[in-house]
Amino acid sequence: MNNTHHHTNGYRTEKPKNEEDLEDPYANLSDFYKNHPAARNEACSSASNGGSKSVKMEPKVEKNEEFEEYIGDPVRLEDMEPFARPSLRDDAPLSSILHPDLDGIDPRIFFKDFNPNKTLRFSRLFAQNIKHTSRAEIWWASRTFSKHQRKKEPEEPLADDVIVGAKKLKLNIIEKVPRVMLADDEEERMRRPILTDAEEMAKKNEEGTVVQPWRTGPAKIWYDMMNLPMTSQAVNYGFKLKKSPQKVSIRSGKPLNYRTPDDLPSTSSGPAPNSAPFLDKVEVIDKSCEASTSEDILLPYQVIEWENDVILDGEEVKDQLLEEFSNGRGCGWIPTQYTRTYEHFVYAANNNAFEQMFDGKSAPINLTGPDSAILPTPGHSIFPSAPCDLDILPWETNIIWDADAMPSTLEPIDFLVDFQDDPLIYGMPEDRRHDEGPDHHHHHHHHRKDGQYTKKSKMILGQVQQRQKQEEDEQMESTMAQFTDNDPFNLSNDDYYVPKATSKTLSNNSLLIQHSTPATNIATHFFPTHPSAFRLRYWHRTPFTRRIVRHWQPMRFQPIQTPVKHQQRVAAMREAMRQAQGGGEVFYMRDVQDLSGKDETLVMIEYSEEHPVILSQPGMASKMKNYFKRRQANDSEPTFTFGELAFSHQIPFLGQLQPGQSLQSIENMLYRAPIYLHKRQNTDFLLIRSMNQWYIRPLPSIFVAGQQCPLYEVPSPNSKRATVFVRDFLFAFIYRLFWASDSSPRRLKMDDVRNAFPHYAESNIRKRLKMCSTFVRQGSETYWSLKPDFRLPSKEEVLSMVTPEMCCAQYSMMAAEQRLKDAGYGEKYFFTPENDEGSEDEVTIEDEIKCAPWNTTRAFLASQREKCLLDQTGIADPTGCGQGFSYVRVSQKPHKDENATPVPKKLVTGTNADLRKLPLKEAKQICRGYGVKEEEISALTRWEIIDVIRTLSTQAAKATKDGEIIAVSGMARFARGNTRFSSADMQEKYRKHCQRIFDQQNQTLANTDPISTDDDSTDADSDNEELASRLESMLEANKGKKNISMSEKAKIDFETEEKEREDLKRMIHGTTNQVEKGEKKEEGEVTAEEKKSASQFGEDVAMSASKISGITANQQLKIYRTCKGPDGKDVTRIEIVTRPQLIEAYTRIRMTRDDTFIQVYAQMDEQYKEEKRKKKRRLQDQIRRMKKNEEKAAHKVQKMTEKKVKPIKPPNPNLQKMRCSACHAYGHMKTNRNCPLYGKDPLTPLKEEDEGSTIMTSVSSASLVAPDAVQVDGTKVKFNLNFAEIRKEQNREEKLKRKLAKMAEAAVRERQMAHLMEYGGGASSSGGAGGGGSGIGGSTGGGITDNDDDDRFSQISGTSSFLNGPPGAIRGGNRNSSVSGSKRRSSMMPEEDYLQGPLKVAHRARADPKVVMSSMLTDIVNELKMISGSDAFVTPVNSKKVVDYYNIIKNPISLQEIKKKISEQSYLLRKDFLDDIKLMFDNSRMYNGDNNILTLTAQQMLQLAGKRMIEREQKFIGLEKQINPLLDTNDLIGFSYLLGEIVQKMKNIPKSALFHTRVDPKKIPAYYLKISDPMDLSIMEQKSKSQEYKSIDEFLKDAEKIYTNSVVFNGAESVYSLKAKEMFEMAEMLVKDQMDTLGELERNINPSAINDAAAAQRGLAMDSDDHMDEMEDHPTEEEEEDDDDEIMDDDMDIDATGYSYDHDDNVAVGQIFNDLAMSDSDEDERAEDVKRPANGDDNLLDSF
């Protein structure tokens, strides 16, 4: 016997010995399937040719009989039957529909078990279980539809007839015989001994000498239990083989050697064709008396208590199934409509999605989550991929259908693994070094230390090991608990009384939220790519501006509709949509229009927090849940209008409910917050604004939301998360643009991306675009084309890159960052790390930064993960009154007090006596003192009494304040151990604090009674002033006192306070003689005289205020306030004001302002109070930090040692020769601190050629204030001056200044006059002097001040700089010099910080006259719309309502069309505009008649338009002249304009660029040697602009000169000459075409006026460039008047510089915004439009 093992993967490949005894598995099939045409695989044919077909198939059937015995044998294709194409076969009628490419493919390449003449494998597997009732009647082969009648079987012929009628066999000879068709030798088979199964198996095991792989495989433990030898070759599993049926013939005269049908070949489809004549056989089953195998083996149903698993009611096991699915401990997964993969099943199980799947609703469920959520975790099993050999090997033969009737003996299966399988099956291989050989480990094992190099497996599984360990511990705990609970001797059912395990439900979010389609697609309407600063300031609080109601007029009707018709239309549309989809629930929120407040049920939720941590955008969904905690099992459920009821033992909030309480909450993926229903007022309503209409609805249900519990962390500014989000947002936007492109390949433009992300650098955008696209330039068009090798992510992948929750977190961060910037916090404060409690670092995080959402969300989520606790001091409390949680993280460890005396552990802290020696009588007395009852004391033993005393004493000691020493007597006398708070105590205290805040918040927010707001403090201003004074005093005290001891500092503070007290006393009482007389009084005593003086002082103050305001102190002011009461009625309240200042303010405001201003001013008061409150908090925080720093410094400061007085060194003679370059003094350098100009701008040395400037230098340096005179200390400026001496010095210098100023001005005037006379040719001296004066004054760096001396000083300085150096050379010098920039700030205040300011220069740019005219016409149109009855002319006439209008009116027009023409700048003349207005009037007359009200309205509009035109006629005339210069009265302007157009057309000639500018003399120096008079188009264009052409001949002469110059230099045949000739011919042609107009203008030109203008221009011309620039920068008064005449209107000029809002202090506090909002004028509206950015969200269709 061959013991060699072949790789068969556990399946036999050789023929078993008892194969002759096996039965064909398809032999017992009924005749219905044996004779079925489909079973024989025959085509539909008549009965005549059926026999031929069967005879023709006979050889194949015989051949397949041999192959059927070896079913499942892994054979090769060359060993199989040759493949026949279906197109060449007669039994394949449907081969024509097969694709030609598939005709030659053998299916056995993929499925070795396939045979065209055999039933398919899948059909054979299920053929055994086909019921009789499931059989299908096939009618396609019959001619009639009548029921088939069972045919009588023909009588069996005699044997002799069969033998005589036997047909001759036809041999089928095959050249290459397959191995499967070869049979064993008959002689060899006959020589084999006949052994029983047991003897044959024992013989195999004895002969075996090789250990088979299956013996040491995974089933080794079972084979060992069977005591099977290691060298066994076979296994007897105890199964019984099925006995072959004995078939006996009915006829008795059968010969013995007669061949039965069993000896004939048969197929799996039925018996052989020639077996039909034989008689039917009767199957005889041997009824054996042997015991069945099933009696010895326990079946699964006998072991499992299957009765308990029968589900009678699905609702009873619903919760149990949901809990099992939520835990995710199942070994398998259930594919559903939403869980098509195992990953989605795990994600759905973790998010409780099965509850929505089983609720019976057909609403679609969105299971799209982050990638990390659907990744499998180690707690869930992963199914390996199915082996590929399942399709090849006959695994179905090893299925045990009946252990007592096995078709064959089962052989052991070899467990083999393939390297293509999952590597987790056989583990990760050990990593080895590259320098190690096969035997290297044995020789050098002792030289290597453990952990010298890290395995890759450790690197891969390093992060997973910790999670696996935690899960194993949890599993072990649950297993032990299960073993304990399932004790068989535990008959008390303790598992029903064990409390449910509590878990942190806040840490995970198991909601399944489906947002609307616009929100899921990140629509730009709701998710802007870059919100503006204005929008971030009013995030989710868009103000109701006057721009929305600007068209509302007091006496005009404004139509407001109810949305009933809209609701009916939407309901009908959605019902039709629902019916079209088959009924059920349909998701309607698909478009932006569906997110409207005009339909469906509305709920209004107001957040109690001023700035919620995070808010969802419009279109995002939330859920309302109602939590209820039952008192007992039969407690009734509360009813709620909104939300779904949830019975929970523990609610997901910081506090818990008491039995019988309920709480509503709003939950989504971002946050969770409790909500409280409030009553709505009957007088309130909801006003909804759409694009063109207003709607009104009853006020919906109103809820108040409590403090949010964030579930999503907000990223920090400029953090990695925020940066990655912006990057992904940019990528998603780019991919969307590519998807939206219809071109091939897809493309986009750079401007689309840059406009969406203006804050992103263009280089970064290009960097992102280069990753997926290439830059293409096609003519003037440029775009980015998608790379052909780049796979564009699908739309689902793009949506997963940026989710709505990510956008909301980013917006929350940006809004908070903007608020902090407005409050004065820079970016350097955003990343200040939190300071540990025990750290000595003084850098602490600001309170405002602690309240930022990125810090609060991080702290809250960390507290839910039990990483920290939340602060209980209320720094980040949003309520400000202790009714909210402060989301600031605090360490879990108890606070260590350094000053506290350490208490030894396990010692008696309060007494030296030992409790064990305490007498019993005294112990009982102590218990009585604690309040223990006498009967309880009598029932206790001695040691129990001692334990009570120790416990009560320890609790009393812990109840004391931190840091106090425990008293020896009292409750804490016998305190035991360390009384400091432990972690458990901290946790308990924290839990009680959270519960108290939670209950207090619920009680406050659930209160529906109105709360009065009249109790606010009115002393906020005085408190702020007091805090400011205290802060200044503290800053002054701390300045320069870092190295002073505490005693000296206290002494200085006392002296300062005493001095201030004495000064205040003198101010109140005046000069007294008490100090001179030496009278003393006790400290703190107040005399009657002082009281009288104080009261007199208060009366004096009141009288002074009354004198100023004109109101006596006894007058009172009554204010009657009318407001709405709770019931909607008007209620009048009376308020009495007694303060004169308030009375005067109320009176002045009422007399000078209107009601609108007062209303806006009252609304602004709340904002003012809020700003004051924030300022007060910042001052308090600063004072607190300063006190803390002082306390820290007090422990470190030591007494200063007395400084030894060092002798003054004699001056160095070498230094005496050194001269300072800053102050020009000797003995030091400019970097020395002794220099008086140290840290300032150095003086610039003057040239000595001008005597006046030299003298002025000395005067200016002498007039500077001494450096020691002005000093800055903290926030105060100290002046140490002697005013008497300074005044004398100023008087002396004033005379000298006047004299020098006159001398310098005279000298400058003489030089300028000489210069003008030399070059100007007799220009007027006054203009030159004025220009020179203007230039001198404008050259100063400091501008003009209020002091006359300073004015003269600035003029003289400017003169000196004009003559000798650059402007500002004397005063100020170079303000950006390296000396002043490199030095640190000096304590001295520079003089120019107070005397000079920045010079603002406004450069006015000329506006487009078409734009100005359009704006003026728009104003007129808007005024026309205000006329009563003008609504009929605003829009075109509706042809459906007025059918015959367009038949009568051929030229219709409306104000809408007129406004469209204005926006397109189609009106260039006034006449065109008035003609359209008149056309509108004529159309109304023609259709409506002269006396119709619409015609009268059109007449009023025409009259008003003409009136406005007449009022601004001069401005319109000026604009028309600027638009079309031909309309100007000066013909020279029109003439020059036409010539300029001709020059432009000459420039447009192709390849004429060489003649546009002059020839460069550096490149072509020989040009100007030949050409003496050069000419080009730029010179001609300049002449036409300057109106130098007076005739046509001059113009043509210059054009011809370009051609002649080219001929002279290049030659007549040159290309350039031909191009110049073409230009000249073009000029002649254009002049000829416009000869009539040009000739008329030339004749109308006045030559005398031209000559005068030319002479005046030549007289003013100057050759000096410097003086020309000076004259241009400072025009004279006459030139300014001429400019004003040319401008014609101030509206045509736009200030390019404007007012700088960034440098105005009022912008920081919002004063300008408030002033603009309080004004009703049109100018204020324009200013508001300028200051406020464009916000496209104001035009949304809803009230969001």
From Swiss-Prot:
Organism encoding this protein: Caenorhabditis elegans
Record-given protein name: Transcription initiation factor TFIID subunit 1
Biased composition range(s): Low complexity: 1372-1381
PANTHER family: TRANSCRIPTION INITIATION FACTOR TFIID, TRANSCRIPTION INITIATION FACTOR TFIID SUBUNIT 1
InterPro entries in UniProt: Bromodomain, Bromodomain-like_sf, Bromodomain_CS, TAF1, TAF1_animal, TAF1_HAT_dom, Znf-CCHC_6
Gene transcribed to yield this protein: taf-1
Compositionally biased intervals (Basic and acidic residues): 55-64, 429-439, 1076-1093, 1186-1205
Classification of source organism: Eukaryota, Metazoa, Ecdysozoa, Nematoda, Chromadorea
Coiled coil: 1019-1080, 1161-1204, 1282-1314
Primary location recorded for the protein, binned into one broad class: nucleus
